[in-house]
């Protein structure tokens, strides 16, 4: 084990879901190993887990042959990922982020494990882990309404960051997953600092019926608002049966001098998704 010619794994996720890349050890000196003969991701200096691996079979292909393998426990740290190969040290275990997913419709519940700490990989691994619960539910996401929440705990922060999203069907499930991954990415890459995530918790509640509504009409209490006042909105939506539902919404306005103008954007999910796709790179779009 961990000798020249034996397999080694770079572990991106462990626990109920295991993900990683497997290659061959080129050389070992003491607790240090050189492996792969090519980069894993080409990330340079990193702190990723490495562990044992077992090659089950080699699948031959004219296009790209590949190995079927099992990944074992974390046993060390990959600290250099460059063009000649990867370098790691056995015995030094890197930090991994605890993750758990609860779902009322999951085939397995809860799902828990750990994911690698990495600016680019952590958001993707969190998305993949959460997808195991939301996309592999007993009934599947099609025709269902999904309520999703994410709790992101940071070291040195008492209160966790909490986010809630809702969606209908497969498209709604994908929107929820990517919106959560975007927040994780923003936390890790939104500044020069690299905050340590102490844990990620997901919760998904699925109902086997579509609870979607479309926006039918909107009425403002007044188009002219005094400083410090709020905008009163009466919104009418309709469900799938055509039944009208009234919503009274109060929107506070930020302090501004007299004569200022504001743009308020109100949309249902389909319109908002289209609007985001068109105006994503427009800095002047209304909030």
Predicted segments with their positions:
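Terminal presequence/propeptide segments associated with secretion/organelle targeting
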Residues: 1-287
């Amino acid at each position: 084990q961990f000798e020249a010619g034996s397999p080694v794994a770079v572990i991106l996720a462990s626990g109920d879901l295991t993900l990683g890349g497997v290659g061959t050890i080129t050389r070992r000196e003491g607790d240090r190993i050189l492996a792969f003969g090519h980069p894993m991701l080409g990330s340079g200096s990193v702190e990723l887990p490495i562990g044992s691996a077992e090659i089950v079979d080699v699948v031959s292909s004219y296009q790209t042959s590949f190995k079927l393998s099992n990944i074992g426990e974390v046993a060390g740290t990959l600290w250099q990922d460059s063009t000649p190969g990867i370098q790691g040290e056995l015995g030094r275990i890197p930090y991994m982020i605890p993750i758990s997913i609860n779902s009322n419709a999951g085939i397995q519940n809860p799902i828990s494990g750990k994911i690698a700490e990495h600016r680019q990989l952590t958001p993707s691994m969190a998305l993949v882990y959460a997808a195991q619960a939301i996309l592999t539910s007993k009934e599947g996401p099609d025709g269902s309404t999904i309520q999703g929440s994410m709790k992101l705990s940071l070291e040195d922060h008492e209160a966790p960051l909490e986010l809630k999203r809702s969606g209908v069907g497969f498209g709604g499930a994908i929107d929820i997953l990517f919106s959560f991954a975007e927040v994780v990415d923003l936390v890790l890459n939104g500044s020069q600092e690299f905050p340590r995530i102490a844990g990620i918790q997901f919760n998904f509640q699925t109902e086997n019926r579509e609870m979607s509504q479309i926006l039918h009409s909107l009425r403002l209490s007044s188009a002219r608002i005094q400083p410090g006042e709020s905008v009163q909105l009466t919104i009418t939506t309709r469900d799938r049966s055509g039944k009208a539902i009234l919503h009274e919404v109060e929107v506070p306005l930020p302090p501004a001098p007299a004569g200022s103008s504001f743009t308020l954007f109100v949309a249902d999910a389909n319109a908002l998704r289209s609007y985001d796709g068109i105006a994503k790179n427009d800095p002047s779009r209304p909030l």
